[in-house]
Amino acid sequence: MKKQVIISHIRKSDQTLQSNEDHSKGVAVWAEKFTREIGMPGWGHFLGELHDKGKEKHDFQTYIRIMNDIPTETGNYQDKTHAYVGALLAHKLFPKGYPFVAYALAGHHAGMPDFLSLKECLKKPLPAEISLEGLPESPDIPATLLKAMRSKPYMLNHLLRMLYSCLVDADYLDTECFMQQDMARLRGNKTNLNELLHRLETHLAQLAEQSPDTPVNQIRKQVQDACRKSAEGPIGIYSLTVPTGGGKTLSSVLWALLHAVKHGKKRIILSIPYTSIITQTAAVLRAIFGEENVLEHHSNLQLNEQVADEESALRKKLATENWDFPIIVTTNVQLLESMYASHPAACRKLHHIAHSVILFDEAQTLPAERLQPIVDALQTYHRLFDVSLLFTTASQPTLEGIREGHTEQLKGFDKIEEIIPVSWKLHERLKRVRLHFRKEAINYEAIANDLMLQHRVLCIVNTRKDAGEIFSRLNAPEEGAFHFHLSRMMCSEHLDKTLQKIKETLKQNNSTPVRVVSTQLVEAGVDMDFPVVYRQEAGLDSILQAAGRCNREGRLPKLGHTEVFRLEGRPVPPGTLSFANQARLNMAVPNDWFAPQAMTDYFTHFYHLIPTFDRKDKDKEGVLWSMKQLLYKPQELMFDTADQIFQLIDNKGYSVVMPYNESIELRKRLEQGELNATLFRKLNRFTVQLTERDLKVFLSAGMIEPIHGLYFLIDSAQYDEKVGLKWNNHWMNETLIV
């Protein structure tokens, strides 16, 4: 009697079967390729061969036949789950080292579980129909990894997640090759980094030819030369501290490509704090390296808008799944939260972060109360997976060695190599701004009057409420003048259009008055240049970043002016912002606020005020956890709970779609039953965050309507072309940085 084929997949287009044997072997080949690249030979083969053994269950075979209208013997099934079987076999084959693979095997569909869930899984009986013939031998655990994990127990969770990444990406890729062959063909065909380095060198040479021999351009050339020299160094952790205007972005990319080529890396990753910076950085890189070599990946991205060619858009969409691309431009949220994720979609990319070069732009924006797990994750990727890191900013945080906090220590990186010698004194040579700290507090009317006296001015404040109050008090702009408001009361689409309009207006004849009132979303990295900047009191890093928008290009005949002020009756919001402001006030007044030593002193004071570098947050049961409690005990790893807890930005609000431009038409399509991921992603560009309490107020007033799980503002009078959502309530006091 012919043995019945164990089915893994059925291609719907032609009802072709893929046997479980073929699928497992295919996954094993992919996974072995990936695990060898992370120094774990044999592990990919082991994982691939075991991961779908559970599909041999009668119940699963009945299920897959019923779902595809294939006749079955029994006609029904009780339990189609299958992932747990691979974990059971790993436990049987590999009793001492099974946790290395059991988490990945048990979670290759639903996500890596907590240890208690894994224990329950391993109590299940092994189904009698599972064949024990031809099972793979258990691989050896490399001695170097064992040594590293004994000295740093937190490294284990990242190693297991990396193995998981290798397995789930292999599983997806083999399944795609069988089920969607046209899609699979779109992967690959990437330009190597040598060619991209050549394109950058050509671009820099053209820039040098076209640029006058000014002191600023001489400094930019000097910074580039320092990056060339440093890039020859070993795989390591580096910093690039360059004042605004010193050519930091292209110099850091030059360093990354040179370093990557020297050490045989496959990609460079630019991690950026704000989507407003990503958009401009990605545009610059696409112009240099070509559309086909730069992958932009963040929550607000619409590939069909960025890429005109449908095939190119699809290729990039596929690349966002696993980051198999030479240059990635992404957010800190996307990168760092993936390193603590537990589900396949977020973890697929992790093995492609191994053997890469990561640039962290505006490093001072990394959240202080998450610094310990961030440092530990990056330290692991450096030590176990040969990743080089470069932290770039004009306001470098102190992340090396032991740093004293209020009640605990921050255990920083072992060593960070600074590229620019202190003796160069770039902060003096690139000085373009004079800081002035106003002693007396000032009210909304007075600050608005001050702004009206300026021809071109940027005012940055701490909260959405303050931005709205000051903007509303500006007099009507005189003929030919422009007034702009920027805050997260505006949806991303609205913000981007306004930012673009501001940049275009600033490039016009200098006689055009331009006044901008903004929250801190334009503070770091946004390419704007004003002769005068006002900054509400804040930490020194924020003040210097704001000053970086002042006389940015050094075109003024004298120093630009940055005014730091206190708002009457408006203290700095509690929490990190308040600690930052207090740290600045606690400092002895330095001779030069822009000197690197001033920033070192500031961060020393700042860290002393931080209550924790590993903040506790509630899981879905309301229990408080820190990452140390969840992932630093090798016998009690809690991957699923850590995924819930680790959020770089508090995201406790509710997204509400605003009636702005295209969103009105998109809403109609949703109401007509068009439910797909592309439409939902487009709508995300038109959302503003509300707290639960304010959402209820809007709902009760009939101004918001739920449609297919999304909330829509239906009262268009509540959304203004200038300021976005009009709502005078306490929650506008909250800061929101994305």
Pin down the residues of each PLM region:
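Inter-Walker segment of RecA-like/P-loop motor cores
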Residues: 290-340
